[in-house]
Amino acid sequence: MTQSQALTQALILALTAPDYARATQASDLAESIAQGLDFDQVEQCKADALLILEMA
């Protein structure tokens, strides 16, 4: 799994978490993963996560 794929999955987890604590945990993970990517990569991951959720 690439860093971009990991970020996309973490964003999906943050958006679909069943409670605030888990959403915060996933959000923190996503933020940590995003540190190694540039702005355009992070924006693409956000778009990918939203697209995946729309298709679900």
Predicted regions and their residues:
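N-terminal acidic leader/helix
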Residues: 1-24
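Short, charge-rich amphipathic interface segments used for partner binding and complex assembly
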Residues: 20-56
